[in-house]
């Protein structure tokens, strides 16, 4: 993916950069593969904010992505590469020989016209989806299942990639992009290669309005609030937080305290925790 940088014509274009979308095909999304999406704006079913700093933004049409890749009967041909407003990775339409059409995540290096395969008999090639038991150690993979048949849940963001480190008995050891080493059943499916749009994290929005287009609202510091709104709030003029350690808006310890349950069921599958930032 190529990135275009702006000159400082206005304060908003200073340091701003956008994707040139050179890989994108000039096609509208397939209507039968899309759904109308109602924005929740960070609210739950009672209208209470459960995820702050969300709301507004451009209207979006949701594209139904095939994370299962369970069409084992026929090879598929990449028909288009498209932009998806609901994720930072690109997506592509696959036309299968049996007449089926599906959206999948775009693997890096795949072009329009390339063939992809799924199933136990598929070759070890970029974009093919194969059970972990058939993939050699050292192979780079993405869109990894946690439960066989449930569909890919791990390593789906733009530019991410995992690596198979070892295989023994029923389990494969996978190194995730975070640095975590995790055991995953060898019956789970994974896609060969890296997710496309690898330069997505190098784009600079440049102005506040660009973030509002994405549906992200401003983040206000706790010390700038009133004491009724945040534990850090209140005081005369610029004051410190007035506490021994930083707190969340709900009074829990912030910045460094572990929030993961000590007895979570998946702890036994994690061989090495992710790296500290």
From Swiss-Prot:
It holds the Pfam family Ribosomal_L2. PANTHER family: LARGE RIBOSOMAL SUBUNIT PROTEIN UL2M (PTHR13691:SF5), RIBOSOMAL PROTEIN L2 (PTHR13691). It is found in: Plastid, Chloroplast. It comes from Psilotum nudum. InterPro entries: NA-bd_OB-fold (IPR012340), Rib_uL2_dom2 (IPR014722), Ribosomal_uL2 (IPR002171), Ribosomal_uL2_bac/org-type (IPR005880), Ribosomal_uL2_C (IPR022669), Ribosomal_uL2_dom3 (IPR014726), Ribosomal_uL2_RNA-bd_dom (IPR022666), Translation_prot_SH3-like_sf (IPR008991). Gene3D superfamilies: 2.30.30.30, Nucleic acid-binding proteins, Ribosomal protein L2, domain 3. The keyword Coiled coil does not apply. This is Large ribosomal subunit protein uL2c. GO terms for cellular component: chloroplast; mitochondrial large ribosomal subunit. Belongs to the universal ribosomal protein uL2 family. Part of the 50S ribosomal subunit. Keywords: Chloroplast, Plastid, Ribonucleoprotein, Ribosomal protein. One of its GO terms (molecular function) is rRNA binding. GO terms for biological process: mitochondrial translation. HAMAP family: Ribosomal_uL2_B. Residues 36-56, 225-259 are annotated as: Disordered.
